[in-house]
Each structure stands twice: as C-alpha cells, then as structure tokens.
C-alpha cells in the first residue's frame, strides 16, 4: 500500500466494491452456436468468454483486420512494410476487465510496458505533466494542483467553488440527471478559471477522447474526471504494447478463440439480421450463418445501419430497436483538431514516444 493510499484511508476514502452478479455458468451443457458481429474490443472479448465456456462462436468482422480503432494493418512503404495503426492507445491500470482479456494473450501481461509520463503539449503554454502523480485520491488531485504551473493560488481563490463541487461528487445516476443536458463547455465556464488552467487541466479530458467540450455532455466530463483521477486507486498510470496491436493483441486473441473451438472471420460484413425458428439468420454478402444467439458488438453508425436494413427486428427485438436512437447520430467524417474555446491547441504526447514500432521506424 502506497503512502497516498494510507493518507486516503486516514481521511475516510474507502473502496466501493461492486458485486458483478456471479458471471454465469462456467460451461454450457452442450455446444450452442452463437455469432458475434464485430471484431473490436467488445466483440473479441465476448468471443473469448463464450468460446471458453463451450459456445460454438463465430466472429464476423467487416474490415480485413480485427480491432476497430485499436486495429493494425500492414502498409507497403518505399523502405518496406510497416504496420500502421490509428494512433497511440495506452491502457490505464484500472482497465481491469480489458486486462483480464489480455491475459489470454499473455498471462503475465509482459508485452505491456509502462509509459513514464503523461505530458500535455500546448502551442501557447509550457508542458503540463499529468504523470508521476501519487496513485490514490485525494493525494493525486492535491499534488496535481499544487505543482501545476497552470494554476496559481489566486486562481483557486477566484474560482467558483460551488460550481466545482460536482467534479468531486460523481454519481452514476444523479450526475447524469443533473448535468447530461449541460455541455462541458458551460460547466468549465462556470468555474471561472483562467484560460491556461482551463485548457491544460480540464479540456484535456474531452480532447483525449476526441470530443470538443462545446459538444460534450458535462456529465461525461465529470464521469471521466472521476474515473481517471478520483475514482480508482491506480492513478493516471498506463501501459502500452511493445509490439503493434495486431501482433501483440489481435492475433493471439484470435488464436485463443480458435483453440477453444471458435472461428474468426474477417472481411465479412453482416447485411441483415432475421429471427428464424430456433434462433437467428445472420446474412452476409456471401451467404449467411444460423445461430441460436447473436451478440451485436458494433459501433453506433454500423448498428443503426444494420437495424435499418433488418425491418423484422422491430417485432423480434423491440427493445434493441427502441434504444438505437439513444446512441446518437453518426459523426461527420472530418479531421479532428484539438482546439478548445480558448483557441489553444493541445495534445497528449506523441505516438512515437510510446509505441516501440513507431519509434523504431522514425529513426
């Protein structure tokens, strides 16, 4: 137990343990076919658990490679073939479920290497370092505020402390009821912080997830502030694979599913889904698959398109169809720029700094 954990306990910080509800039977009584639509983190995680329990699972992924936004694919360059990716992705240490899945690829998680820092880079102000903080609250937050060059004591005195209290009082129901109709931009404006502190200490929570604070729910920002800073004992510490994602994650997980009797099929888009006697008919451009159970592990635009193309789902799965609009509209395919209301461009580190493959290629 670290000193920050001890201090937290002394002032009343306690862990809140959630009962996962048992997790179901360790094995199905007899093999039953299931189809998982989507081969990203959600789909492959579902396939791993189902295959281990004896389900005859088939993963159907529309792209030629697994992983979605965490995917990797080969690119032919003048100097040879290089694995390409969507950018730098690291795994925070409170990602317990995901790390449990990754242990199927490597029981020791030896392929994950710690990233030593978490620098916030700005075109206008000096670097702000979010790394190397005590892991446990409230010591991590206090240390960040005390050492930050972006926030002075006079700034804290002029801040609207009542407006800031919701950042410290996250609740999975009450926070969304109160703040989901307020933007993160409005919440940050109410704090009365100087531009530098706002951009370097708070807007980073929206920019790190490719959101602009003017279009992001204030409840989501409060949830992120809680989950990454105040709501876990691991702190802002994370690791990244020492190989590209395809080599380190997706190929081993696909082999794990296949070892347990499952199949992983890429380059196969699902076009429609129909209820049939005894299960479902999952149609693809090249044919189809019959399954007793179906897991839809798609992003919101793909899910909405599949539901629209499958009109019989309204009667077969009315709850699913009713929930689809709540997932939001598909975002425009535009180039993201981390530009806040202050006109300050910020970003978190460099891809080549954390990815060994990219670092080697840049040399």
Segments (PLM) and residue ranges:
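Mid-domain catalytic core of redox enzymes
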Residues: 2-14, 30, 268-363
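Short, flexible hinge/linker loops that cap or flank conserved catalytic cores
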Residues: 26-29, 143-145, 288
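Helical element adjacent to the flavin cofactor pocket in flavoenzyme catalytic cores
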Residues: 224-285, 289-293
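Conserved FAD-binding subdomain of flavin-dependent enzymes
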Residues: 77-112
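Mobile amphipathic helical/loop "lid" adjacent to a hydrophobic cofactor/ligand pocket
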Residues: 98-99, 103-104, 109-218
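N-terminal Rossmann-like FAD-binding beta1-loop-alpha1 element of flavoenzymes
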Residues: 30-59
């Amino acid at each position: 137990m670290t000193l920050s954990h001890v201090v937290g306990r002394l002032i009343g910080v306690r862990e809140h343990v959630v009962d996962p509800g048992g997790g179901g039977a360790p094995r199905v009584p007899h093999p039953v076919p299931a189809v998982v639509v989507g081969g990203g983190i959600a789909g492959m995680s579902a396939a791993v658990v189902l295959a281990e329990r004896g389900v005859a699972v088939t993963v159907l992924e529309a792209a030629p490679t697994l992983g979605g936004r965490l995917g990797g694919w080969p690119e032919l360059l003048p100097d040879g073939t290089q694995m390409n990716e969507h950018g730098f992705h690291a795994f925070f240490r409170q990602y317990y479920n995901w790390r449990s899945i990754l242990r199927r690829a490597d029981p020791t998680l030896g392929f994950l290497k710690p990233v030593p820092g978490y620098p916030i880079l700005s075109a206008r102000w000096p670097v702000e370092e979010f790394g190397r903080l005590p892991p446990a609250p409230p010591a991590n937050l206090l240390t960040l505020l005390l050492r930050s060059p972006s926030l002075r004591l006079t700034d804290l005195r002029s801040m609207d402390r009542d407006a800031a209290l919701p950042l410290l009082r996250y609740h999975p129901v009450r926070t969304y009821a109160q703040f989901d109709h307020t933007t993160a931009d409005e919440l940050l404006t109410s704090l009365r912080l100087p531009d530098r502190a706002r951009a370097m200490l708070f807007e980073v929570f929206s920019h790190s997830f490719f959101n602009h604070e003017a279009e992001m729910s204030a409840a989501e920002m409060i949830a992120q502030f809680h989950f990454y800073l105040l709501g876990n004992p691991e702190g802002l510490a994370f690791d990244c694979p020492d190989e590209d994602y395809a080599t380190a994650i997706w190929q081993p997980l696909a082999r794990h599913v296949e070892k347990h009797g499952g199949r992983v099929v890429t380059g196969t888009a699902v076009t429609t889904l129909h209820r049939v006697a005894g299960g479902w008919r999952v149609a693809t451009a090249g044919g189809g698959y019959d399954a007793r159970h179906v897991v839809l592990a798609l992003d919101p635009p793909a899910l909405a398109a599949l539901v629209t193309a499958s009109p019989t789902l309204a009667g077969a799965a009315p709850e699913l169809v009713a929930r689809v609009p709540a997932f939001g509209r598909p975002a425009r395919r535009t180039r993201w720029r981390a530009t806040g209301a202050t006109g300050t461009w910020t970003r978190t580190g460099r891809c080549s700094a954390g990815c060994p493959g990219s670092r080697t290629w840049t040399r």
